[in-house]
Amino acid sequence: MAPAVTRLLFLQLVLGPTLVMDIKMQIGSRNFYTLSIDYPRVNYPKGFRGYCNGLMSYMRGKMQNSDCPKIHYVIHAPWKAIQKFCKYSDSFCENYNEYCTLTQDSLPITVCSLSHQQPPTSCYYNSTLTNQKLYLLCSRKYEADPIGIAGLYSGI
């Protein structure tokens, strides 16, 4: 009986944190897929007053948060085309406490930026469609999934 209890305690101590981390990575990857990828690009009804207003309304509802994020990036490319960049993450981004990488290719992206000319109780966004490289946050160093976007690459 004692060896079985010892084995169970060992598994809980060793594998418990691993299982929690794996679940956290799966949730991060799923949230990224749901909130940061729109492929093919969706057309929202005119009642939303533009692409970003429809998308950000959906995003705030999905996150159950009424705050207006200042900026949000949406990638218009297939999951596989984005996921490949996290096969090997060459850097650790301390500001985000995550592994990160710069995409090797430019991707079609919509930048949704909060408009400064708005009443404080509403969220109105400007849309900018661009084709750029970006910094992806990855779930781990090797064979990872994207879990966030740190920003756009502004270099040459």
UniProtKB/Swiss-Prot annotation:
It comes from the Eukaryota. GO terms for biological process: defense response to Gram-positive bacterium. The gene is RNASE13. One of its GO terms (cellular component) is extracellular region. GO terms for molecular function: nucleic acid binding. It is found in: Secreted. Does not exhibit any ribonuclease activity. Glycans are attached at N126. Residues 1-20 form the signal peptide. Keywords: Glycoprotein, Secreted, Signal. Belongs to the pancreatic ribonuclease family. The keyword Aminoacyl-tRNA synthetase does not apply. This is Probable inactive ribonuclease-like protein 13. The keyword Secreted applies.
